Amino acid sequence: MAVPKKKTSKSKRNMRRSHLALGKVNVIVDSQTGEYKLPHHVSLVDGTYNNRQVVTKKIETAEEVA
């Protein structure tokens, strides 16, 4: 079984982990609703993508929910 000969210093450990950081999330403002959304994703507020309606909202009544 392989065992390290010397203790890895904090500097070496942190340099090895330097590429593991998460990148920033690119968030844009939706031109129609003004809400924040991820690029190339459907707007969660009104269901539009690229200025086209792609998802219609289903209106649930109290009878359907119960």
From Swiss-Prot:
Keywords: Ribonucleoprotein, Ribosomal protein. The keyword Ribosomal protein applies. GO terms for cellular component: large ribosomal subunit. GO terms for biological process: translation. GO terms for molecular function: structural constituent of ribosome. InterPro entries: Ribosomal_bL32, Ribosomal_bL32_bact, Ribosomal_zn-bd. It holds the Pfam family Ribosomal_L32p. It comes from the Bacteria. The keyword Ribonucleoprotein applies. Belongs to the bacterial ribosomal protein bL32 family. HAMAP family: Ribosomal_bL32 (MF_00340). PANTHER family: 50S RIBOSOMAL PROTEIN L32 (PTHR35534), LARGE RIBOSOMAL SUBUNIT PROTEIN BL32 (PTHR35534:SF1). This is Large ribosomal subunit protein bL32. The gene is rpmF.
